[in-house]
Amino acid sequence: MIIYPAVDIKDGRCVRLVQGEFDKVTVYSDNPVEMGLKWERMGAQYLHVVDLDGARTGQIQNTPIISEMAVKLGIPVQLGGGIRTVETIETLLCKGIHRVILGTSAVKNPELVKQALKTFEDSVVIGIDAKDGMVAIEGWAKTSEFTAIRFAKKMEELGAKTIIYTDISRDGMLAGPNLKAMEEMVKAVNIEVIASGGVRNIDDIRNLKNVGVSGVIVGKALYTGDLDLKEAIEVAK
């Protein structure tokens, strides 16, 4: 199981939101690149980056920072937030981003998913953000008509190999992950499931490992010091 430290970028800074609310922001660093390098030095094998401004506006906003990250970090970076076209995917992969995450665009534009998966294969990951079991879109501002599991199965049919499953109600709350929902998702699909949202301590890492997810995205708990990255990586092995 891989631990993915999260670097969320808003207005050029490294921040954390609570439940995806843009007015509930805590700034942890003015230098997201340095933050990524810090997690790499501590043993991270992979970095999870979100352009929050991009998620909100529908197109990548923090391109210079993201490009710098891709160049300076020696570990792969997966990026989400505002990726809505094949051209954007191609540009980001050319800049050195390892994987891109399609979220809102996957719900609204299945044709894009089909084309992206056909062209870029494993370099495309589907981000499924759920609120009470329903898929949320547009920076979590709206809820779609899909249940998370139905949507995940649809993405698997289109050729997706990996999904990132986020429980919005837990995100940034340090309330513990929704283990039941994660387990249901793992059992429902035959592709890799990366868990996101609510991780608060080392026990949560152990529990998620037992559920069978292939990776865990950790944000707030790393920034508050409630979770030690090195210990988390050790437990995840």
UniProtKB/Swiss-Prot annotation:
One GO biological-process annotation of the entry reads: L-histidine biosynthetic process
Answer yes or no on keyword Ribonucleoprotein.
no
- Residues of the active site: 8 (proton acceptor), 129 (proton donor)
**Enzyme class, first EC level, given as a word:** isomerase
Q: Which InterPro entries match?
A: Aldolase_TIM, His_biosynth, HisA_bact_arch, Isoase_HisA-like, Isoase_HisA-like_bact, RibuloseP-bd_barrel
Q: Which reaction does it catalyse?
A: 1-(5-phospho-beta-D-ribosyl)-5-[(5-phospho-beta-D-ribosylamino)methylideneamino]imidazole-4-carboxamide = 5-[(5-phospho-1-deoxy-D-ribulos-1-ylimino)methylamino]-1-(5-phospho-beta-D-ribosyl)imidazole-4-carboxamide
Q: Which Gene3D superfamilies match?
A: Aldolase class I
| Keywords on record | Amino-acid biosynthesis, Cytoplasm, Histidine biosynthesis, Isomerase
Q: Which GO terms describe its cellular component?
A: cytoplasm
Subcellular location(s): the record lists: Cytoplasm
**Molecular functions (GO terms):** 1-(5-phosphoribosyl)-5-[(5-phosphoribosylamino)methylideneamino]imidazole-4-carboxamide isomerase activity
Q: Which pathway is it part of?
A: Amino-acid biosynthesis; L-histidine biosynthesis; L-histidine from 5-phospho-alpha-D-ribose 1-diphosphate: step 4/9
Kindly name one Pfam family recorded for this protein.
Answer: His_biosynth
Q: So what EC number does this one have?
A: 5.3.1.16
Q: What is its main location?
A: cytoplasm
HAMAP family registered for this protein in UniProt: HisA (MF_01014)
Q: Give the similarity note.
A: Belongs to the HisA/HisF family.
* Protein name per its UniProtKB record: 1-(5-phosphoribosyl)-5-[(5-phosphoribosylamino)methylideneamino] imidazole-4-carboxamide isomerase
The upper taxonomy is:
Bacteria, Bacillati, Bacillota, Clostridia, Thermoanaerobacterales
